[in-house]
Design a protein with these regions (language model features):
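N-terminal cap/lid segment of alpha/beta-hydrolase-fold proteins
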Residues: 2-49
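Short, surface-exposed "cap/lid" segments of acyl-processing enzymes
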Residues: 47-50, 54-132
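Conserved acidic catalytic loop of the alpha/beta-hydrolase fold
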Residues: 126, 130-135, 139-181
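Conserved alpha/beta-hydrolase fold motif
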Residues: 182-183, 206
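Gly/Ala-rich beta-loop-alpha elbow adjacent to hydrolase catalytic centers
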Residues: 183-192
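A conserved short beta-strand
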Residues: 201-218
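The feature captures the conserved acid-bearing segment of alpha/beta-hydrolase catalytic domains
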Residues: 218-283, 288-290
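Catalytic active-site module of serine/aspartate enzymes centered on a nucleophile-bearing elbow/loop
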Residues: 297-327
Length: 327
């Protein structure tokens, strides 16, 4: 790989910064520590920004860098969103990226995310040749696959507790930002549903890219979506005493909220996106499924954030967010 700064890059002028959403202070034999702080990196246009900031929540074992660049070195969705006039806040969920983790305060982590799992999720065997937007190698040792897997870490063993932490940190970020739009990917979708549930009125809309599902799914090696779209408890009106009572009840923070689910044509996640939309609509949301092939955008899998047409896959998301901004 040549030095990136010597390649033909793009000259940009933006404002940027970083801060933390601190974790709870806990006592350990060694002293006082923080439990689960969340790192936040933000960028905004040099001169002003659209009214509502965007909060970008990465998926599964990924990190905030999922939004900032692609495995082949191009700008990711976050810089394209800034170019479109938005202020973006990119988080590293607890235990991922720059948000530190220790089992003494969070609990045990699962196995390190292996190449084989990454291949199955993002670049599976493609005998029919439909997954054209990942033209790179699919074998362990191929450069772009190395770049993608480098960002992936383990998930906490206790999926529900990790989602509670994510929801709390995102809710507190919303306290800082005020009304915002959430943009989530994959397993990060659960954190988005929960954060909106904890701060009704603070989320103007949710763009969920390839959200995990279907409702009440068992996720092998990860956990169970016991409460419909989340492993952690979600508040309903009237109150659901058990997960089985959730379907059809109003979910504060989602009720009345515009939500768009974006799916790629070659992704298995597209197969259950309509079921997620139905679940959300039954909770009072205004949900729609945006299947990219219906817009003429074809060949994308689960990682449509960083596939070769990422500059095109982000455009329907930008267009939808603009409708929320102007509502």
């Amino acid at each position: 790989m040549p030095p990136p700064h010597r390649s033909a890059g793009e000259a940009i002028t933006i404002r940027r910064g970083q801060f933390w959403i601190p974790g709870e202070r806990v006592r350990l034999p060694s002293g006082t520590a923080q439990r689960g702080p969340m790192f936040v990196h933000w960028e905004a246009p040099a001169d002003g920004a659209h009214r509502l900031p965007l909060v970008l929540v990465h998926g599964g074992g990924g990190q905030g860098s999922d939004w900032t660049g692609t495995p082949d070195g191009r700008p990711g969705w976050a810089p394209r969103l800034v170019e479109a006039g938005f202020a973006v806040y990119v988080v590293d969920r607890c235990g991922h990226g720059r948000s530190p983790y220790h089992p003494d305060v969070i609990g045990p982590m699962g196995a390190q995310f292996p190449y084989e799992a990454a291949k199955e999720l993002f670049v599976p065997e493609d005998p029919e040749g439909g997954h054209t937007r990942w033209p790179f190698g699919r074998d362990i040792g191929d450069a772009e696959l190395d770049q993608m897997v480098s960002a992936m870490g383990p998930l906490p063993v206790d999926l529900a507790e990790s989602q509670r932490i994510d929801a709390d940190r995102l809710a507190r970020l919303l306290d800082v930002l005020g009304e915002s739009v959430l943009l989530t990917h994959s397993l990060g979708g659960a954190a988005g549903w929960l954060a909106a549930n904890r701060r009704p009125g603070a989320v103007a809309g949710i763009a969920a890219v390839e959200p995990v599902g279907p409702p009440f799914a068992e996720l092998p090696g990860i956990g169970e979506l016991r409460w419909g779209l989340t492993a952690a408890e979600i508040t309903t009106e009237p109150v659901a005493a058990t997960p089985e009572e959730v379907p059809g009840k109003a979910i504060p923070g989602l009720t009345g909220t515009p939500i768009a689910l974006f799916s790629g044509g070659e992704s298995p996640f597209a197969g259950f996106a309509d079921r997620i939309a139905d679940f959300l609509d039954a909770a009072g949301a205004s949900a729609e499924h945006v299947h990219l092939p219906e817009l003429g955008i074809t060949g994308n899998g689960h990682g449509l954030l960083w596939e070769t047409n990422s500059d095109r896959t982000v455009k329907p998301v930008i267009d939808w967010i603009r409708t929320v901004q102007h509502a």
